[in-house]
Amino acid sequence: SCSLVGSEMCIRDRASILVYIKGKGVVLKEPSVVAFDRDTNKIKAIGEEARLMLGRTPGNIVAVRPLRQGVISDYTVTEKMMKYFIQKALGRKTFRRPRIAVCVPSGVTEVEKKAVEDATYQAGAREVSIIEEPIAAAIGAGIDISRPCGNMIVDIGGGTSDIAVISLGGTVVSASIKIAGDDFDEAIVRYMRKKHNLLIGERTAEDIKIKIGSAYKRPEPDYMEVRGRNLVTGLPKTIKVSSEETEEALKESTMQIVEAIHGVLEKTPPELAADIADRGIVLTGGGSLLRGLEELIAEHTGINTMTAEDPMTAVAIGTGKYVEFLGGYRE
């Protein structure tokens, strides 16, 4: 996501890019997808327009996500995409180059950070600062990170899930795993193929996840009609899918997140662990909207788990505040 304060802005990998302007809130939210023509290597579309092309493009047009799991997979395309979003958010009449803060997952290496920084300068930034995702998420979720007590934040994005224990404005213990929202979609695609011999696209899988996806048994199952291609006959087919099936499809991914939380709790100093048991675990990020995730984590850790008020924008807002109050938090 991407947050911006005055002409200060933060960009980060999510399945979407979010732009936050101080006083205006979120002004732009678009998927980090770029469609380009394979023959001419020219960019055809960026953002929402490109997402609509996912899985629907003629052979010569490819839709790609240049930022995968917080890491640049295609440098030139990332730079062009950032330039596009910066201009769209600020308007073309901007004379001053913005100060941009870039959010990265906690596990990103120095080399990867440098690549993100360089791409941001190339996209037109006057100044670039790099912030770790869990810190921004905690601030955005309304946690006062400057106090000497332990807070656990679990930020489930598109590409990565970041788990961190934060105290006194810094990360004490953290882990970043490459299991998140995109993996939920892929798990649903695999499940439909294996269980129903039905081939569905990424967008359909995302729809299933949003409408009936669940990580924990629901008192009453939800159902939805799903269309795809029957792998046996090769013809289109519609079937009814239940939320219980999504629970089964997502089990491996959700349990990996639970295990990563366990791992971080095991490494947490006892005083801070006691604070977390007291204060609970806070979930942020688009992936945290998966129904039943709070219950699943609470059941396996014995710690009360809640989702931040506006999990989708917590990191964007937190980054904005971080840039504003950098001095205050540092002190």
Residue ranges and their predicted role:
Residues 1-2, 7-8, 12-156, 164-282, ...:
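Nucleotide/phosphate-binding catalytic cleft detector across ATP-hydrolyzing
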